[in-house]
Amino acid sequence: MAQSIVEAPIRVDTSRKIIHVDMDAFYASIEEREHPAYKTQPLVIAHDPRQTGGRGVVTTANYVARQFGVHSAMPAAKALELCPTAVFKTPNFPLYREVSAQIHRIFHEYTEMIEPIAFDEAYLDVTTNKKHIHSAVELAHRLQQEIWHQTHLTCSTGISYNKFIAKLASDYRKPAGVTIVLPQDAEPFLLREPIEKFRGVGKKTVPKMHDLGIKTGQDLYAQSELDLIKQFGKLGYILYRRVRGSDDRPVEYLRERKSIGKERTFGPFLQSTTEVNTHLKAIAKLVAASMQSHQRHGKTLVLKLRYGDFVTITKRRTFGEFIPNDAALFEQYAEEIFEEVVDDHFNSGIRLLGITLTGLAPLAFENLTLPLYPNDN
């Protein structure tokens, strides 16, 4: 007689008060503040593709440009195609960093438990706070008011008992919204979310989810833990808990990032050096954008490759100076390392490539390195 598997109940800690603060179109809003005429024009924060030979990626866009379908991480040339009247503004990262620091000083007036995610977003644990404000909603409103008063910028906030739900909530009423998800409301909130909203479910996982009939949180909830782990491994284990409202990750206010990198897996496997170089170029762009967003640079570049037969090679190159955050440079070094390490296992194809920077330090005027090429300005 077959025995049914009884799954243990998931522990859910609802004692915390977590706020996810997400600045609204941060870089574009700063430029609108500095240049009020931009407020009524489609504004794209990126190098103008008409001046770069079509190169470049959109950092962000204002809400006017978004109505044309322009969004972050889009090729700048595609943004121009969608919106020929767009104003392209080269990112001014020193200014954005300065404003971000100003906003973080406001956060510190309320709590020391702050986990920065990027220039424009952070988690705050306000379970106990310096102002002794019992209501997290009241505290979120005060944060919004103080940020507006000091910077003339708006932010949206999500409030809940864990980081996962708070981040989902912050996206609900943009711009300038406040959304709270109470413990008793978490389950219906999560069940109606599209599966794409669950962290870890990316472009490659979505089709597999859809093939299994998983399109919403409710569909995900209906899956057994065993089935999710069989299909998705560690991600399945995590998703089983997330859709049940469980996320015990702390707000890492002492966290210091030790590396920044990106990996891609391939199916079918890569079979030629040309394919490898094409994907290294794309990965290098993502890493450069992430390094710039986190305002870090590093001294060591690491290339990771995994062959079709699962043999994995990791090779690093360390430099005496910080490497400029330049995608072309990351690509060049990664290609050089690849040529050094590639061997007969290449006959089985390549299933994974990754580029990582380590030996990180904050970008600062005293250790900035000038671009190698004049066109990089």
UniProtKB/Swiss-Prot annotation:
Superkingdom classification of source: Bacteria
Binding-site residues for Mg(2+), renumbered to this chain: 22, 120
GO terms under biological process: DNA-templated DNA replication; error-prone translesion synthesis; SOS response
Location of the protein in the cell: Cytoplasm
Catalysed conversion reaction: DNA(n) + a 2'-deoxyribonucleoside 5'-triphosphate = DNA(n+1) + diphosphate
Residues of the site described as Substrate discrimination: 27
NCBIfam families assigned to the protein according to its UniProt record, in alphabetical order: PRK02406.1
The protein's role, per its UniProt record: Poorly processive, error-prone DNA polymerase involved in untargeted mutagenesis. Copies undamaged DNA at stalled replication forks, which arise in vivo from mismatched or misaligned primer ends. These misaligned primers can be extended by PolIV. Exhibits no 3'-5' exonuclease (proofreading) activity. May be involved in translesional synthesis, in conjunction with the beta clamp from PolIII.
Cofactor details (free text): Binds 2 magnesium ions per subunit.
Domain UmuC span(s) in chain numbering: 18-202
Primary gene name: dinB
Family: Belongs to the DNA polymerase type-Y family.
Needed cofactors: Mg(2+)
Keywords, comma-separated and alphabetical: Cytoplasm, DNA damage, DNA repair, DNA replication, DNA-binding, DNA-directed DNA polymerase, Magnesium, Metal-binding, Mutator protein, Nucleotidyltransferase, Transferase
GO function terms (MF aspect): damaged DNA binding; DNA-directed DNA polymerase activity; magnesium ion binding
E.C. no: 2.7.7.7
Cellular component GO terms held in the UniProt record: cytosol
Record's protein name: DNA polymerase IV
Gene3D superfamilies cross-referenced by the UniProt entry: 3.30.70.270, 3.40.1170.60, 5' to 3' exonuclease, C-terminal subdomain, DNA polymerase, Y-family, little finger domain
